[in-house]
Amino acid sequence: MSIEPQKPNTILVGRKPTINYVMAALKLLNEEGAPEVVIKARGRNICNAVDTVEMLKNLFIKNLVIKKVNIYSESLDSEGKKKVSAIEIVVAKG
């Protein structure tokens, strides 16, 4: 498992309520002027990441553009035997 530093415009979606991640993305896009936001999740939290983007798009930012979706697997152990699915969704204002 490789640990890489996260960019400041990255949101890691976990078990908190979805609205928390929506508000974090809104803050990055509106107040901090980030050109794009990367929403990442692994395993069971992938559905929360998708819900976050859908809430942003349908309720808050009508011209939200989904620039890129990357689906991949990450190794959980050094041998690479255990893997977990992951998703990265890059969004920006249109």
Swiss-Prot record:
The keyword Cytoplasm applies. It is found in: Cytoplasm; Chromosome. The keyword DNA-binding applies. Its main location: cytoplasm. SUPFAM superfamilies: AlbA-like. InterPro entries: Alba-like_dom_sf, DNA/RNA-bd_Alba, DNA/RNA-bd_Alba-like. GO terms for cellular component: chromosome; cytoplasm. GO terms for molecular function: double-stranded DNA binding; RNA binding. One of its GO terms (biological process) is chromosome condensation. Keywords: Chromosome, Cytoplasm, DNA condensation, DNA-binding. It comes from the Archaea. Belongs to the histone-like Alba family. Binds double-stranded DNA tightly but without sequence specificity. Involved in DNA compaction. This is DNA/RNA-binding protein Alba 1. It comes from Aeropyrum pernix (strain ATCC 700893 / DSM 11879 / JCM 9820 / NBRC 100138 / K1).
